[in-house]
């Protein structure tokens, strides 16, 4: 959580009365370590990924794929391997630049002439997900991957920090080590079901504290 100043700041600005919602167990334990009440509800962006919703996500490889890159976590070798892997395994590859320098980083890669670049805004990304029926999402942007699952798209998220791995430990999202290209290749070709394990009881418990109780 950081040093003494950070802990003091959190204890000052966060409520001692209410239970705080956290996205994973690690964040829950951090808040509890400074005597604040917390419950692990998962990220609110995941709350609609119920068993009924996930059952509608395709299990087989799509014809097309959306790729994102992370300009803040550059690895030319691994990212070039990923681009080559996707070009060899999908009929169409789309690149959606989300960060400020994502496009600049992507342009430094080789073998990208056949990749379709999507405008760097959420509306274009949403339009692509809605207009292409058979499309997977693969890459490092966690919330772009969750957004794809909200649109019922098969999703593979590659880790570049602890956020995706921490959430995956509790909620079973499809996360792979960035360097595990062999495992990713096998997963792309395999049939699997998306089974995000949302804790609806925790979500309901957190929401109920805000209900006005009648005397």
Language-model regions: role of each:
Residues 1-215:
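Active-site anion-handling motifs in enzyme catalytic cores
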């Amino acid at each position: 959580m950081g040093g003494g100043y950070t802990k003091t700041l959190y204890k000052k600005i966060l409520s001692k009365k209410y239970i705080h919602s956290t996205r994973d167990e690690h964040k829950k334990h951090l808040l509890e370590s400074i005597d604040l009440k917390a419950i692990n509800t998962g990220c609110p962006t995941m709350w609609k990924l119920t068993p009924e919703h996930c059952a509608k996500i395709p299990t087989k490889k799509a014809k097309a794929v959306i790729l994102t890159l992370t300009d803040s976590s550059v690895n030319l070798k691994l990212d070039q391997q990923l681009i080559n892997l996707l070009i060899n395994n999908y009929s169409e590859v789309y690149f959606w630049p989300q960060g400020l320098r994502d496009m600049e980083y992507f342009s430094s890669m080789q073998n990208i002439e056949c990749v379709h670049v999507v405008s760097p805004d959420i509306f274009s990304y949403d339009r692509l997900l809605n207009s292409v029926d058979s499309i997977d999402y693969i890459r490092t942007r966690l919330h772009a991957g969750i957004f794809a699952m909200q649109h019922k798209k098969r999703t593979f998220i590659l880790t570049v920090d602890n956020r995706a791995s921490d959430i995956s430990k509790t909620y079973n999202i499809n996360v792979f080590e960035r360097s595990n290209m062999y495992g990713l290749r096998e997963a792309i070709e395999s049939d699997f079901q998306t089974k995000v394990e949302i804790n609806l009881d925790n979500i309901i418990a957190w929401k109920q504290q805000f209900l006005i109780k009648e005397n």
